Amino acid sequence: MLYYGTGQPVPMYDPEYRPGDNLYTNSTLAIDADTGKMVWYFQYTPNDAYDYDEVGSQMIYDVTINGEPRKVLGHFGRNGFYYTLDRTNGSFISAAQYVKNLNWTKGIDPKTGKPVEYDPSKKLQQYAAVSNRKSDQVDVCPDLQGAVSFFPTSYNPSKHIAYGAGIDGCMQLKVDETRMGGPFWNGGIATRNNRMGGHISAIDMTTGKVKVIRPLDYPVYSGVLATAGGLVFTATLDGTITAFDDESLEPLWSFNVGTSICAPPMSYSVGGKQFVALHVGGGVPWNIGVLKGTPELHTLEGGSSLFVFALD
């Protein structure tokens, strides 16, 4: 079986141009590898108006939930919720909010897994943060880059904990009517005048509930790496790589490389010694929006280097 996430509908911010659920966008798809046919799908944000595509990691694991062994797929949704699905049939098990700033919906229906405002009889959905051609500029959280976007996530199979790291912030959204022949971003304007922070979050996979949400001073694009030795690594855009305790997410060690970090950390061993390495440098992605809220990142030096650390 192949499991993968799909992108957002377009135009991204004008759902009136594309009424309906817009299947199979913003979804996890299960595809039979032999036939190429879709076995099941689960859509996270029908008729999406916020650019919450779900192309991030689809984690598969076996775990006991309420005393019952389950074959599970876990996913840090870009919309700010961690979803637990039955990977054999796509049925919804649970969802938990894993980021502080979230207002686009008032919650997830515990039976269906859909946003509580979702009405299948309507072609145009109105979630808690109303964004359409008639609405004024609205603050929407999470930001269009999500709480966790395409950044790698990780989990510890012995402790049954999943980890995600990303962005904690909001966007200001004003919808314009889409017109044929317009530019790629036609249909919406998204800016960020507020400060953009980050987060690292831990989920108990046996319950689907959040263990810890730790706010970070800067956004994360590098994802997260969990080790068998009780450490979790991530790196923020200011150039700081940090090792956290894998239970409490208390920071244990950090090092600033002097330039931005967007690449994921990796781990390997040589001669019985474990190392963590990551590529650093380059520009800040989507820099206009991110730098507007964190202007001190303008002073970061450029460059491209490989940093390697030994775990003693």
Predicted regions and their residues:
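Short Ser/Thr-interspersed hydrophobic loop/turn segments at strand-loop and sheet-helix junctions
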Residues: 7-9
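Outer-membrane beta-barrel transmembrane strands
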Residues: 145-149
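Residue-level marker for isolated small/hydroxyl-bearing positions within beta-strands
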Residues: 5, 76, 165-167, 235, ...
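Short, surface-exposed beta-strand/loop micro-motifs that present aromatic residues
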Residues: 151-153, 267
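Conserved redox-cofactor binding core of oxidoreductases
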Residues: 12
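Membrane-proximal interfacial segments on either side of biological membranes
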Residues: 157-163
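Extracytoplasmic/lumenal domain signature
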Residues: 15-54, 61-69, 81-139, 170-219, ...
